[in-house]
Amino acid sequence: MRKSYRVKSEKDFQQVFESGNSVANRAFVIYKVEKPENKHFRVGISVGKKVGHTAVARNRLKRYIRAVIDEEKLEIDPQVDFLIITRPYARNFDMVKVRKNLLHALALAHIIEEMPDEVEEN
């Protein structure tokens, strides 16, 4: 995922955090703000120390999240900035669990239309 797809500055993070709508599941909180002037979506990822006590664990989760976003970028609404805040419940997730829970949260936030069939719960 290129850097132009990331919310990076503190000002942009605060803007999305303060003026955005939020939805959550057990593993992730999503803050979303509509930006009609955007050419493509931007995402910010936050994995706190309560989630992973080592940098290795936190970076692994961020890498998994970025991989899911990269795989699903054609499905994501291009006129939105959103933040993904990871909760401690996701501490020991593997790639499959991150994908399933993140797509569920993105569908709740209406950032993607619906969960792909291969990850839906029965």
Swiss-Prot record:
GO cellular component term of the entry, any: ribonuclease P complex
Catalytic activity reported: Endonucleolytic cleavage of RNA, removing 5'-extranucleotides from tRNA precursor
Alphabetical GO biological process terms: tRNA 5'-leader removal
Principal EC category: hydrolase
Keyword set, alphabetical order: Endonuclease, Hydrolase, Nuclease, RNA-binding, tRNA processing
EC assignment: 3.1.26.5
Molecular functions per Gene Ontology: 3'-tRNA processing endoribonuclease activity; ribonuclease P activity; tRNA binding
Functional description taken from the UniProt entry: RNaseP catalyzes the removal of the 5'-leader sequence from pre-tRNA to produce the mature 5'-terminus. It can also cleave other RNA substrates such as 4.5S RNA. The protein component plays an auxiliary but essential role in vivo by binding to the 5'-leader sequence and broadening the substrate specificity of the ribozyme.
Family to which this protein belongs: Belongs to the RnpA family.
Self-association and partners: Consists of a catalytic RNA component (M1 or rnpB) and a protein subunit.
Name of the featured protein: Ribonuclease P protein component
Organism whose genome encodes this protein: Lactobacillus helveticus (strain DPC 4571)
